[in-house]
Amino acid sequence: DAFKCVIEWLTGDRAAYTDRTSNIAIKADWSNGNVAMTGRSYGGTTDFAVASTGVKGLKTIVPVAGIASWYEYTNSQGIATGGVAYSDNLAFYCAGRYINTGLYQNDTEWDPIKETYPAYLNRIYNDQIALNGDYGTHWATRDYTAGNEGKAGTASTSTYNNFNCPALIVHGLNDTNVRTKQFQLMYNSFKNAGQNVKLILHQGQHITPDYDSHKTSLLIDGESYNGILNKWFSHYLYNQNNGAENMAAVTVQNNTDGSWTTLSDWDGNTETLRLACGDDGKTTVNSNYSYADYGHFLDNTDSTAARAIYTMDVDTDTVIVGTTKVHVKATPIQHLTQQAAVASDENTRAVAPRGVNHEEAMNSLKRANNDDSDIAVMSADSGSRDALMMSAMLIDMSDTPFSTEALDDWGYFIEEETGAVNWVGSGAEDYAVIKYQQTETNYKVIAQGWMDLANPGAGFDSDSASAVKKVELQDGKYYDYTLYLQPTHYTVKAGHKLALVLFTYDPNMASYSENYGYTFQNAETYAEIPVNSFYTLNYSAGANGTVTADKENGAQMEANSLVTLTATADSGYDFSGWTVNGEAVEGGATKTFTINGNTTITANFTVHHSSSGGGSSSGSSTTVSASKSDNGSVSIDKTSASKGSTVTVTVKAKDGYKLDKLTITDAKGKTVDVTDKGNGKYTFTMPEGKVTVTPTFVADNGSQTENKSYSDVKTGDWYADAVKYVSDKGLMSGTGSDKFAPSATTTRAMLMTVLARC
């Protein structure tokens, strides 16, 4: 709320004062009332949180590695992935007066609450312990994807009705601090709200591309990140017409060579690969392994008692885009007798609320006093355990070593300066342009996922992991699970293998002192992997011009990726249009195309005709163009033609519409005769001069409304013709199967319906 209040002050909707006592108001008279927010990590989180309120004056946000849902930061599909309790620790660290008590002695603001605040921390600690990794009210109030509805204490309903500003979302595809699902949740929120939303996805970890504290710069497709911000903010805060709002929906860095690809959509993958786990039989995995054992999980492709691994060959370069779904039909092996003592002890401790002395808990010398152990039981008398982790990994494997990012001893990517600098100006220190040091490996983890065996109904949305949906597990009973791996964009090279690894707990996320496991049915366990194929791009210029592009001719391009071409006519000629795979398409001399198949693009040119003088010379070609329509499309077999030649027009109406008429006019506005050849094809003979093709589409209401008669409308009635007209056109359909009710009053709603059908 504090950030929201500042925005309200900047827009003139809230009063502010010079201090707490003088009652002297101060206005932000220097503000134009247009506000943007940006920041990384917690700063990116607050951007998204404030946007979820729909506050007036917030024109755009640029969250970097931000959190959309605090539940997803430390939990996944009903299981805790970083300790059951965390929110209280964050609240402690955000309370400067609590941490630095010596600086705030006799503080009139802090003194009244300094005894109450620890109780608040313990309350939210106990709320998390009670949920034990499940989604509930505690997390709903910290789930910004739900907007104000979530803050009211209810579970998210995915209405997204509070987001009313554009967003440029920035995230590292190798960020394991704030996992990649967070950018997907943000993207969904803005997209479902109908807002202009863009993604910049780099191969880094938890960083800002222009990293001020490091004085380093990871260029975004050759452009500085701060330069992109400058254009974005200039457009949305100062109404500069610089085209920033038209940047690609997705700008993503490739894992193979560090190059960049632009995509028309994040969710536009074209195919799904199925990685199967066998045709029959059952497989069992257990948790009887150590952290050291886990470090050797991927040394080979042989399944063990600790993990099952399945592979498939990759024959062509393939891009994984989005969220892989791993379907598992499994039954738990709980070893309930081993848990009896722990369960009984848990019931005893549950008599009084658990608590933590946060000042001691946060002191590294006193951490032993922090009673923060995970709970792995429901209760002693339930006969069922809770919080049993099921884990999955998707792996890129190759017999031949391939390049990946090198890590230092702390697990961070090692930066290398390229020798180039990003000039900052104003006497500030320039940023060194960097890339990531590479090393050789035979495997790399592409994506991971975790869920609770006791939450088989948990899905991608956080609230699907609600505690009320938890089940009491029964050994021998099979449950259907879907693990959602973290979203990614990753290219697997031809000749590699994709491997799916299934196991129990991830030692980086949880620890279990007691053994458990699960058995799954092989035939009903598999991964659905969303992928984009690669296609060949070819482009050329017809006679009398040239064409340039931001991609190489003959390039292999990922499905849904974008290429921008510019056509330049030779002297004495004009650009006359584009042809894509032999079909004419609309567009100016500079046009961006989406690639979804092998594509050949040709730029066409015609002789330039002066506006004065004696007309075109015999045999020269002139332009054929088509007017755009929202309810259908027109393609022309040639975009320029000479007088007397035959031009073929193909018309295709959208679903629910049909062609009403096709009008072709010459340069003087005279109608040109058209021949209907059937199947949506029409021809005409090219006249002298430029020709324009204009289709008109109308709603196709089928035969249901045609020639319909009504028992209360007689042929001689004065309104009979009007009733027939609106009925035949599908504008009105009466009040029943054979009644029109011509004397009824027409309401505003009815009028709006008629207008919508026009």
Language model segments and positions:
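Accessory cap/linker subdomain of secreted extracellular hydrolases
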Residues: 3-12, 16-30, 38-40, 47-162, ...
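Short beta-strand/loop motif that positions the catalytic acidic residue
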Residues: 169-171, 175
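Conserved alpha/beta-hydrolase "acid-adjacent" motif
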Residues: 176-182
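Catalytic histidine neighborhood in serine/cysteine hydrolases
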Residues: 191-209
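Intrinsically disordered, low-complexity Ser/Thr/Gly-rich stretches
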Residues: 284-534
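Conserved "repeat-terminator" motif of extracellular CCP/Sushi domains
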Residues: 535-539, 589-610, 619-626, 676-702, ...
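Surface-exposed interfaces of beta-sheet-rich extracellular modules
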Residues: 562-589, 646-682
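Short, solvent-exposed alpha-helical surface patches in non-cytosolic proteins
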Residues: 718-729, 736-758
